[in-house]
Amino acid sequence: MTNTGMFELCYLYYDEKTMEHAKRVANEAKSLCNLFTSLPYTNNFVYQLGLAHDLYEDTTIKRGVWFDRDFEENLQLLTKEKDVNYNDYIAKIRKMAINPTYMPAYIVKLADMHDHFAQVNTLTDKLKNKYMAAMPYLI
């Protein structure tokens, strides 16, 4: 899928606030790619994953239809299921990142956490504590 195609797909499912968050995450993730020189994926793959990172968790999009296998597996890894503890979810992303196939999900999660911390006007104490508690599991 092209970057334009991913934008169009995300615009169909995200509200304006979520789309703005997704764009910030995508841009940050693309920048972080420069730190990982052995990444077997292009910056565009990581950028698109950043855009799509909340599709399964926060929308009604049908899973397993839109993306190729590698993208789908990374997106599934980024999707926190409701019955999973947040710290366990973060720890799984970190553990899976040992395999270069899943490094894009790790990069996107780093960018996602950074964006949440950067939104000081909307970062509640509850969210701040949640993300701070999860950081040791991610880094």
Where are the regions a protein language model picked out?
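Active-site helical microenvironments for divalent-metal-assisted chemistry
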Residues: 1-139
